Amino acid sequence: MSKRISLTQFLVEQQRQHGRIPAQLRLLIEVVARACKRIAISVNKGALGEVLGSAGSENVQGEVQKKLDIISNEVLIEANEWGGHLAAMASEEMDSIHVVPNRYPQGEYMLLFDPLDGSSNIDVNVSIGTIFSVLRKVGHQHGVSEEDFLQPGKFQAAAGYCVYGPQTTLVLTVGDGVAVFTLDRETGSFVLTQSNLQIPADTHEFAINASNHRHWAPPMKRYIDECLAGREGPRGKDFNMRWVGSMVADVHRILTRGGIFLYPWDQREPDKPGKLRLMYEANPMAFLVEQAGGAATNGEQRIMDLMPGKLHERVSVMMGSKNEVERVSQYHREHREAAGH
């Protein structure tokens, strides 16, 4: 049997050999992983733990909160606020940032997270997950504000997600490739099961909510119509559609075997650039996808180059296999040029 490498050992070796991970960042990632284990226990208990169903409240996005959304958010805050690695946290479930209380030491990092992505799938037992992103606090001034969080995704120090499915799997990057860890329930440790994950440049799978076809912009309609035309169409090959409705599950499949994930702008809410959150979902997933050799764009710009104007900013998302993402971007460019923009 090959030697099993735990998450802790992997991070320590990265710190020693490559200098990629400062000690504070390593400890922060370990705390996030421990919090994910606690969330996994609550998710796995399901109805037995009386954690399913709606909490009867809405988050800042105007979405009905599930009980597990609130539990997961509290787990992440409680686990991370006292360790001395963080200055503040921001969550999709909270209106404003959570500054580390004065009674605890403050660190140089800021943690952003979607505590339970895909939570609309909780009650039907479909894979859901936690997405997280780590930024460094810029400057040495005392205190931290919302403005400190407004950095392009290219400045992320680390990003990852934990998917709660048939296995509990942690997928992580610190800017040196993508590593996958599987939770060994017997020992309680995350164990390295894949390193240097790579997304194939070409694919025959796409992930999109096709029921919104009539609301899309012309370049998105063109791309999907060509995929659906299959072998007889301009692409000359058949495509499969996969859509779970949980970003973690859909992107995990794409990281594992290729594909393109699409959550575009649509005309039902024309003033909103998209539905997914730039800081909590798009940036960390874009970092992972790019580190795995893929690409991530909003149709006009690389996602990790976007300068956020506010904490809960939304964005169109097209990410995955590089050649397909480039094709979608090309269709958007051609449409803009034809329209004279």
Curated annotation (Swiss-Prot):
Reaction catalyzed: beta-D-fructose 1,6-bisphosphate + H2O = beta-D-fructose 6-phosphate + phosphate
Source organism: Leptothrix cholodnii (strain ATCC 51168 / LMG 8142 / SP-6)
A cellular component term, taken from the record's GO annotations: cytosol
Gene Ontology terms describing biological process: fructose 1,6-bisphosphate metabolic process; fructose 6-phosphate metabolic process; fructose metabolic process; gluconeogenesis; sucrose biosynthetic process
Binding site for Mg(2+) 1: 92, 114, 116
Protein name: Fructose-1,6-bisphosphatase class 1 1
Keywords: Carbohydrate metabolism, Cytoplasm, Hydrolase, Magnesium, Metal-binding
Cofactor annotation comment: Binds 2 magnesium ions per subunit.
EC number: 3.1.3.11
Biological or metabolic pathway of the protein: Carbohydrate biosynthesis; gluconeogenesis
Keyword Transferase tagged: no
Molecular function GO terms recorded: fructose 1,6-bisphosphate 1-phosphatase activity; magnesium ion binding
